Amino acid sequence: MRWPNSWRKNSEVMEFAVELLPVLRELIAGEQSFSCDGALCAELERFHLGPLAYFRSGGKLPAPWRRQFCGQFRQQAGNALRQQFAFDQLAAMLEENRIRFTPIKGVDLAFRVYPVPGLRPFCDWDIWIHPDDCARIRDVLKRDGWSCELEAIADHHFAMRRKNGFCLEPHFTLPNFNGIPVRELWKECIPIQEGACRHALSPELNLLLLYRHNNIDFFRKSNLPKLLADLGFLLKSSRINWEKLARLCWSFRCGSPELLFQAFPEFFLKAAKPEEKHSAEAARALRSILLAPPQFETYELIMNARHRFSWEWWKTRLRCLRPDNVRLKYLKQNQSGNFALFYCHDFLKKLYNSVLFSAQSSSAELAEFQNKLEKIEYFSSAVPNHSRQK
């Protein structure tokens, strides 16, 4: 199952996404057997929701679509079983070496939140390592046969590791939580049993992670069906302490996911949520952005930001010039003779893009998008950090 990307650039499909929201809510709720005609099946296929429709319908779908969705579901279920077996081996190895870790994102949601793992496809395994164990994790993985193309550190994770066709991404902090003390975040990780090294995110931090991860890079990587499905199953499987969530948002100085509930009331119709306190104007701005993620170039957004050339803006831009960022971007080892050449190339490319987009006048569409970001920032402090890897 692949989550859709093409819908972002097509106004007709975008309009359908709004009509699909009650259907997606019904599929997640699973309170009654799901049934649909061929036309709706075709639309579900466009959004790669066929396996979920097959699972909820008990196979009661029009014959051609039943066979197609059944094949997709079985393929995903088989792949999930293979992934689960291999991941359990990794988890056992980490337990033996007393490496404290927490599965996050897809590998956590598939096996712990969704009704069956086959409904939540994912590519790599994201695990978050306890800060006191980060110094040992790379050597432990190397001894176990996990290899990487180059050893470099990104904004929130170590280099990708591979073994037997599987990909592992060890994190030293959560994505888009930069500036928040890691030990404070780790307090929201719960051991799966007494004395275990394997932990699980608290429902409140998991909810916050899904929301903030979706906001990376000016919402350019947003995937609304995927986000809503993840949130829907999380709310269905977990009891959210809304007061605790509010305390976490205040402590971490980050926007609350509650704004998303107000932005999509037809989807979160029955979700237990606190009284809506956010601006309806900010919610409309968030809804508009998520229904049609921006198609602007990253540097076009960076060089037209209202706060450009501020101290925070400069710190973010300088972090992009870290040698490890260039190594990850061009897959060049530190000892490579061409590294200096690639570093100069990357610097000149950034300089060219900065001058190019600074000289261009802002379009009406870009100005409108910037206004939407400002509304979200003002009412919820939820404007994402700039991309660190451009």
Language-model segments: which ranges?
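Conserved NTP-donor binding/palm subdomain of two-metal-ion nucleotidyltransferases/polymerases, i.e.
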Residues: 2-123, 129-390
